[in-house]
Structure formats: structure tokens, C-alpha cells
Amino acid sequence: MAGVEKIKERILEEARAQAEANIKRAEEEAAKIIEEAQKEAAAKKAQILEKAKQEAVDVKKRLKAMAELEARKKKLQARQEVVDEAFNKTIEKLNSLPDREYEEIISQMIVNSVESGSEEIILSPKDKQRISPGFIENINKKLSQKGIDGKIKLSEETKNISGGFILKSGDIEINNSFEAIIRMKREEVEAEVIKALF
């Protein structure tokens, strides 16, 4: 019986040793899995943080670029407003010239624009009241001096222009209003105006 007890005890001891070895191996594997999981989590965390940092840098760059673009747009808009104001002031100055001087400028413009000498002149309602009674007669004299048959007429019609005139020949109208002239000349002189203003 004592031999059976010894065998039984030995089997139990081996089973215990085997169980302890299995437990130890399982604990080591669990520790290894936990360590690898922690390393992987740390790597993912670092990756996520790096990605977030890069996205933050990208967002910052985009915001900066947008802000710079907006600032440039506002600067250009402000510059455009100043240039517009300069051209508008030119029209205002022309319109506020003394009547005699204004009439002389318009008269010279008409003489330089006429081709046949039988065109009609259309003015704004304000300018029609502003010109002297001999305005058309003086233009026709100047045309005759240039060798053009001076038969210019002042049209009954008026146009809503701030200054200048419209030259009408049959169905054709040539817009010589200050706005139209400034608009045409603006492209030619705008760069110089910008250089002078800024």
C-alpha cells in the first residue's frame, strides 16, 4: 500500500509540477501578449498623435493661405476702390469746370470727333441747359476752318450721361460721354495711375 501511495503522490507531484509549468508558461505568454499589445497601442497612439500633428500643421497652413488670400483680396479691393475714386474724381472735376471752360473742352472734343459735319450732338439734360446759345454755331465755324462742311445740329433728344456728348449720324451713335472715354482710356492708364497712387 505504501508503494501505491508513493506512486499516487508522485503522479500528483508531476501533475502539480506540470500544472505550475503550464500556469507559468500561460502567465509568460499572457505577459508577452500584454506587452506586445501595449507596444502596439503605444505605436498606434504615436501614429495617431503624429497624424493629428500633421493634420494640425496642414490645417494651420491652409488657414494661413486662406488668410493671406483674403488679405490680398481686401488689399486689391481697397486699391481698386481708390483707383475707381480717382477716375470718378476726374469726371467730377470735368463736370465742375466753369461753364466757359467746360464748353470749350466739349466743343474741341466734338470738332475732333466729327467726320461728315452733318452729325447731331446729344447732350445730357444738364449740359443742354448749361451751354451758351452760340455753342453749335461756334462748332460749325471751327469745322469750316478745318475744311469740313459745318452743319452740326443739337438734338432735341437728351441722354442720361454725366458729361460729354453722344455723336449721332443716322442710326449710329458714338458715345463720347466722360464715362465712356474714361472707361476706354482706363485700361491704357490704369497701371500708371496705380503706380502714382501706390
From Swiss-Prot:
Q: Name one GO cellular component term.
A: proton-transporting two-sector ATPase complex, catalytic domain
Q: Which Pfam families match?
A: vATP-synt_E (PF01991)
Q: Does the keyword Magnesium apply?
A: no
What keywords sit in the KW lines? Answer: ATP synthesis, Hydrogen ion transport, Ion transport, Transport
The Gene Ontology biological process terms listed for this entry are: proton motive force-driven plasma membrane ATP synthesis
Task: Provide a Gene Ontology MF annotation, just one.
Answer: proton-transporting ATPase activity, rotational mechanism
Q: Domain of life here?
A: Bacteria
Q: Which InterPro entries match?
A: ATPase_E_C, ATPase_V1_Esu
Transferase among keywords: no
What protein family is recorded?
Answer: Belongs to the V-ATPase E subunit family.
| Functional summary from the UniProt entry | Produces ATP from ADP in the presence of a proton gradient across the membrane.
Name-wise, this protein is V-type ATP synthase subunit E
Instruction: Give the species.
Output: Acetivibrio thermocellus (strain ATCC 27405 / DSM 1237 / JCM 9322 / NBRC 103400 / NCIMB 10682 / NRRL B-4536 / VPI 7372)
Higher taxonomy: Bacteria, Bacillati, Bacillota, Clostridia, Eubacteriales
